[in-house]
């Protein structure tokens, strides 16, 4: 049997279906529903007020996944809902016609009889349709689509009543005797259909598209009119069947009432019925005979209960609207009484009343957004807060430079509050529990001096106050009082610290912003706070997590020493991959550099751009720092020398180029694209640097990867001074000045190999490390090194900024082997002429120690073949012949 989808969200079934109850069709149905919801952007009215909620658990059997058999209709199908709504209007007609026919008609009379049969026809169709409508099991809340169970349920409940109320009286009346007037009684059976109206109002009361107040009022009005209509029809029926028409209530106004038109009689009966129901007018129905008196007795008792029900409902509706006002007035009265009873100052009493009035206003106008936000899921709360307040918080000086992640979290945790004019937000000397951001309005910053309040300044939109007390953990410095209606964002100190604990780098930025703000302030109070705060930082008494980079950026060697003693890693990095040694070297903080080196900081560690601390000191023109770093093993790696040379040229810093040479670098080397420092100097037009580079042996005909030579660039740019300099320059054969530790090999005429990689941090390039040849692996700085996985892997790998094991022979370019330096040592005292070949050690002390072992005496100095004394190991090249001697 073919199946079709059952919809719970008002989606039409455009397909004919097919297949069984397999998961494929179920999945298609789910996908179609999801597409429907995505297109509309919101769920239809059937999703919440009329649909089903799935049961808990991932493996529940939800009715949303049911695929109904063919010809079975879902009770949630919008077409079936429309059919039910249409029948409700027919029921309203039946509610009027049935009592009227019972009281005023003795037999069928057109056009009512025709309309009755038409209406009966629609309800007959509904009886047949009900046999094909699935129903919900009240126990399992699953949709039952078995035709047999549907038929049995309907047949055992409402079928007999629906059939009887739909059966035409013309067929039924022909079976009765003429003396039996059953037309009116039979018409009253149709009132069974009123249950549909009750169900319809129950659905409307839950539908958010309709006002609950007006739905309830409409329902009560219809109930009242129906009761009055039934009362008039029933009482008229009693009068019409009474033997003596003159002894009825109708005869009180017109003795010949039976001769009046039926409309007049109906109007008279309705008048007496409504005056009795509402107990208004000049009197109630006056029962003349015993039948009328008996009916009126029950009618009045019923009216008493119905009136109580209506009055109770209307009272609840009205009280719900006015309850807030009553509660507000009671609260205001209680607050005023409290202030007067305790002799509070008038200013405090006014603040109490103003705050309560503002809270009532925000409640009544729907502005109390915090209560609404707190009732929503976290994701929705975060999105709302981000939309409303992110732009304001992003401009606060305290959060300049922090990550977007922390800023988003801070915005989510902030609470929006309204404050009326002249209300104290913060009191001077109170505990620092919160700080505030001003969204709208204005506040006065007030200081109490010698018992007198003085306005220090005024804060406008986008300002923050209370942050000094919160971040420095000291009593609030000022009283903050609103000038006009203001909206504030409040952030709790505990929440802030918890967020900063997970973002240590951002915490340092926040503290730095605060200290800079205090430093820029001209207020003497702020200057005192700055001094106290710096002292607390040096003593390590701040709750905020501080990093070495923060201390190095401030040049605070006391704080740096305190953090190092607490176990902070001397090589920890900030978000840019810079270590505290990078920062201290760039700022020339001598004591900070000494502390870091003493605690094991790596002098050759690189940041994310490939810069080393030695280069930071060189480019910052801190010669003492550069010398200190060099003495502690800092070097310029071969793969970065060309990059540093290019930076020095761009900054037009000739001294930096000289320092590069001083610390073993070759400023004539090309980068990975074949570009040399001379190329850049010509492009920038730095004549003095061009002269210096030519003196260092730079090749003015060296082409880069695009074929441009320095000479060609000078001709292209038309720089006459440089062109003249090139023309007058006499090319001399320059013996390459190697970086110490790099062996020399004969030039084969093959040009320097060019690489497509970046000019810095090349993989597989050679660096200097105590005169030995090592391999410098390319490092990619990212968040991995700070993660748990990075920490674990760093213990098992030397690639994470640690030393790389040395190898006696390292593969060079083109598959050749590059061997370490070798020298020949000899001693005139032993009479040797040939000498002995040894590996060049890392220091002069080691060389003298080797000589002692080889020569059998204790040498004290190293000489060249010509007799010149050598006092630095870096002056010795591969293949040199050395003489060892001792002082006489």
Swiss-Prot record:
GO MF term list: voltage-gated potassium channel activity
Tissue: Predominantly expressed in flowers; especially in pollen.
Cytoplasmic topological segments: 1-84, 135-155, 206-219, 313-888
Organism: Arabidopsis thaliana (Mouse-ear cress)
Subcellular compartments: Membrane
Gene name per UniProt: AKT6
KHA domain location: 822-888
SUPFAM superfamilies cross-referenced by the UniProt entry: Ankyrin repeat (SSF48403), cAMP-binding domain-like (SSF51206), Voltage-gated potassium channels (SSF81324)
Protein name: Potassium channel AKT6
Keywords annotated in UniProt: ANK repeat, Ion channel, Ion transport, Membrane, Potassium, Potassium channel, Potassium transport, Repeat, Transmembrane, Transmembrane helix, Transport, Voltage-gated channel
């Amino acid at each position: 049997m073919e199946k079709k989808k059952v919809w719970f969200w008002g989606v039409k079934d455009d397909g004919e279906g097919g297949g069984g109850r397999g998961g494929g069709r179920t999945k298609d149905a789910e996908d179609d529903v999801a597409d429907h919801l995505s297109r509309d952007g919101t769920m239809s009215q059937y999703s919440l007020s009329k649909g089903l909620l799935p049961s808990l658990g991932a493996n529940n059997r939800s009715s949303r996944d049911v695929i109904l058999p063919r010809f079975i209709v879902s009770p949630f199908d919008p077409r079936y809902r429309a059919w039910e709504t249409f029948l409700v209007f027919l029921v309203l007609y039946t509610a009027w016609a049935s009592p009227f026919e019972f009281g005023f008609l003795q037999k069928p009379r057109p056009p009512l009889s025709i309309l009755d049969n038409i209406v009966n026809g629609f309800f007959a169709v509904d009886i047949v349709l009900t046999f094909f409508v699935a129903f919900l099991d009240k126990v399992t809340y699953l949709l039952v689509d078995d035709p047999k169970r549907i038929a049995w349920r309907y047949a055992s409940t409402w079928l007999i009543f629906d059939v009887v109320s739909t059966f035409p009286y013309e067929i039924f009346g022909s079976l009765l005797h003429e003396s039996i007037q059953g037309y009116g009684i039979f018409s009253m059976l149709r009132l069974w259909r009123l249950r549909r109206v009750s169900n319809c109002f129950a659905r409307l009361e839950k539908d958010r598209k309709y006002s609950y107040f007006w739905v309830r009022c409409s329902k009560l009005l219809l109930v009242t009119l129906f009761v009055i209509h039934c009362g008039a029809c029933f009482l008229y029926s009693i009068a019409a069947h009474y033997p003596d028409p003159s002894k009825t209530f109708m005869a009180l106004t017109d003795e010949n009432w039976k001769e009046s038109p039926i409309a007049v009689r109906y109007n008279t009966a309705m008048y007496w019925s409504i005056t009795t129901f509402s107990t208004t007018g000049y009197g109630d129905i006056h029962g003349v005979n015993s039948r009328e008196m008996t009916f009126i007795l029950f009618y009045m008792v019923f009216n008493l209960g119905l009136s109580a029900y209506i009055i109770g409902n209307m009272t609840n509706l009205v009280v719900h609207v006015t309850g807030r006002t009553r509660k507000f007035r009671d609260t205001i009265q209680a607050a005023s009484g409290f202030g007067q009873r305790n002799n509070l100052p008038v200013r405090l009493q006014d603040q109490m009343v103003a705050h309560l009035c503002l809270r009532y206003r925000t409640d009544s106008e729907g502005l109390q957004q915090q209560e609404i936000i707190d009732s929503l899921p976290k994701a929705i709360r975060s999105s709302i807060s981000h939309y409303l307040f992110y732009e304001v918080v992003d401009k606060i000086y305290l959060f300049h430079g922090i990550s977007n992640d922390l800023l988003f979290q801070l915005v989510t945790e902030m609470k929006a509050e309204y404050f009326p004019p002249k209300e104290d937000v913060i009191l001077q000397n109170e505990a620092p529990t919160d700080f505030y951001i001003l969204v709208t309005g204005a506040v006065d910053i007030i200081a109490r001096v010698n018992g007198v309040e003085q306005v220090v300044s005024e804060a406008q939109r986008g300002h923050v106050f209370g942050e000094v007390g919160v971040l420095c953990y000291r009593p609030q410095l000022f009283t903050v009082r609103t000038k006009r209606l203001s909206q504030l964002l409040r952030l709790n100190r505990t929440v802030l610290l918890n967020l900063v604990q997970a973002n240590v780098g951002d915490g340092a930025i926040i503290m730095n912003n605060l200290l800079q703000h205090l430093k820029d302030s001209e207020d003497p109070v702020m200057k005192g706070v700055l001094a106290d705060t710096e002292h607390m930082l040096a003593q390590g008494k701040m709750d905020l997590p501080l990093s070495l980079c923060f201390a190095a950026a401030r040049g605070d060697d006391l704080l740096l020493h305190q953090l190092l003693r607490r176990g902070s890693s001397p090589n920890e990095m900030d978000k840019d991959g810079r270590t505290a040694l990078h920062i201290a070297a760039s700022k020339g903080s001598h004591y900070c550099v000494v502390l870091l080196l003493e605690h094991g900081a790596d002098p050759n560690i690189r940041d994310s751009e490939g810069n080393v601390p030695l280069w930071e000191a060189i480019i910052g023109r801190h010669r003492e720092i550069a010398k200190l770093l060099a003495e502690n093993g800092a070097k310029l790696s071969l793969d970065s020398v060309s990059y540093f040379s290019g930076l020095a040229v761009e900054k037009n810093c000739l001294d930096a180029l000289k320092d590069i040479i001083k610390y073993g670098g070759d400023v004539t080397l090309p980068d990975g694209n074949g570009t040399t420092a001379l190329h850049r100097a010509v492009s920038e037009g730095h004549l003095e640097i061009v002269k210096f580079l030519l003196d260092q042996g730079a090749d003015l005909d060296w082409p880069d990867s695009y074929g441009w030579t320095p000479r060609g660039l000078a001709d292209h740019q038309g720089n006459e001074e440089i062109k003249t300099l090139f023309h007058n320059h006499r090319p001399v054969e320059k013996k390459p000045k190697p970086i110490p530790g790099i062996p020399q090999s004969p030039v084969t005429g093959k040009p320097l190999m060019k690489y497509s990689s970046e000019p810095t941090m090349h993989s597989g390039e050679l660096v200097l490390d105590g005169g030995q040849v090592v391999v410098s692996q390319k490092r990619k700085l990212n968040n991995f090194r700070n993660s748990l996985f990075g920490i674990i892997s760093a213990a098992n790998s030397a690639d994470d900024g640690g030393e790389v094991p040395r190898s006696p022979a390292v593969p060079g370019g083109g598959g050749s082997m590059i061997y370490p330096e070798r020298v020949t040592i000899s001693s005139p005292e032993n009479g040797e002429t040939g000498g002995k070949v040894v590996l060049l050690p890392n220091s002069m002390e080691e060389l003298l120690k080797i000589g002692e072992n080889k020569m059998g005496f204790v040498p004290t100095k190293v000489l060249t073949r010509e007799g010149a004394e050598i006092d630095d190991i870096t002056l010795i090249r591969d293949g040199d012949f050395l003489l060892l001697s001792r002082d006489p």
